[in-house]
């Protein structure tokens, strides 16, 4: 398989162009060049500094990649929502990091994928094989995994152009001020707590990143808890949690962004779940939509808060999508 890009304008360096298109670092692009996978106008690219002219065709070969499996299978139960030759859709459990980082010592989702001998894309670092987008460690729900580089590039493109739809369910301690609210701002590390992100009220600052979310109230309990839907237009670290904090609202079970660190007397995890995901299949271009079931712990907690009949009604996927479309 291969993917072809057309340079829309002059570029001083091909590595800068591909880094932008593939949403990876220039070093990762250089690795692809070293492996003989990048061609410009049908000629193999040898250096990242190759200048591009408007209309140049850049071809990226996508060989079949089978990561070396781990010696020991990980004791994790992860539901596979969908699988074909190009991709996986998984229901990630909470308390599971997606990929390795310097501070991460425990097994990750990528470790599990390798232990199951899945073929995975390798456009990212080896710790991130297959990973097109991420979920926070404590967040459960739908995540798409690329089995090959062609799929990885196509899905990354859909993320970049906002063609991939991602919808979350969250339980708030208090209702939204309005039935529908949106946050559009820049996010950066909180200078007072490096574990947190903070929404900037002013313009963009160094190392901050643009972000946008929409929120809609789905169901309010008698004691004032609010089940909401959240739609992502970008996918920044802790985006939903930081945006809600900007609105002075907090998710039940979120000890990092919660009021005084605690929002519930019970020992529960954060009530945040990636519920719906939709995108075009990279090969067939068929539009796909997946409803990723709430995990048992979150569903049982919600049943304590809301009437089951009302809960089932608002969790209907068409109702959630309509809630964001309707004005």
Curated annotation (Swiss-Prot):
Gene3D superfamilies: Pseudouridine synthase, RNA-binding S4 domain. Residues 12-79 form the S4 RNA-binding domain. GO terms for biological process: enzyme-directed rRNA pseudouridine synthesis. SUPFAM superfamilies: Alpha-L RNA-binding motif (SSF55174), Pseudouridine synthase (SSF55120). Its EC number is 5.4.99.-. The active site is at residue 136. Keywords: Isomerase, RNA-binding. GO terms for molecular function: RNA binding; rRNA pseudouridine synthase activity. It catalyses: a uridine in RNA = a pseudouridine in RNA. SMART domains: S4 (SM00363). Belongs to the pseudouridine synthase RluA family. This is Uncharacterized RNA pseudouridine synthase jhp_0682. It comes from Helicobacter pylori (strain J99 / ATCC 700824).
């Amino acid at each position: 398989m291969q993917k072809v890009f057309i340079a829309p304008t002059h570029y001083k360096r091909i590595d800068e162009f591909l880094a932008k298109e593939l949403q990876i670092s220039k070093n990762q692009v250089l690795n692809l060049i070293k492996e003989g996978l990048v061609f410009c106008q049908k000629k193999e690219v040898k250096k990242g500094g190759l200048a591009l002219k408007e209309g140049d065709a850049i071809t990226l070969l996508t060989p079949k990649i089978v990561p070396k499996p781990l010696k020991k299978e990980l004791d994790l139960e992860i539901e596979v929502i969908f699988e074909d030759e190009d991709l996986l859709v998984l229901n990630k459990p909470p308390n599971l990091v997606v990929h390795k980082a310097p501070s991460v010592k425990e097994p990750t989702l990528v470790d599990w994928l390798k232990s199951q001998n899945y073929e995975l894309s390798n456009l990212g670092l080896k710790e991130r094989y297959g990973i097109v987008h991420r979920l926070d460690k404590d967040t459960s729900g739908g995540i798409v995994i690329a089995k090959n580089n062609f799929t990885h590039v196509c899905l990354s493109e859909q993320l970049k152009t906002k063609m991939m739809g991602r919808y979350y369910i969250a339980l708030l301690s208090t209702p939204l001020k309005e039935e529908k609210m949106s946050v559009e701002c820049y996010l950066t590390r909180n200078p007072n707590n490096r574990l947190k992100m903070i929404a900037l009220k002013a313009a963009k600052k160094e190392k901050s990143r643009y972000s946008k979310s929409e929120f809609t109230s789905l169901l309010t309990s008698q004691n004032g808890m609010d089940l909401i839907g959240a739609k992502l237009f970008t996918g920044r670290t802790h985006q939903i949690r930081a945006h809600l904090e900007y609105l002075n609202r907090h998710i039940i079970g979120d000890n990092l962004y919660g009021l005084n660190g605690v929002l519930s007397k019970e020992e529960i995890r954060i009530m945040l779940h990636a519920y719906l995901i939709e995108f075009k299949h990279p090969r067939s271009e068929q539009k796909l939509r997946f409803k990723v079931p709430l995990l048992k712990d979150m569903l049982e907690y919600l049943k304590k808060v809301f009437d089951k009949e009302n809960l089932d009604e608002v969790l209907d996927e068409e109702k959630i999508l309509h809630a964001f479309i309707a004005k």
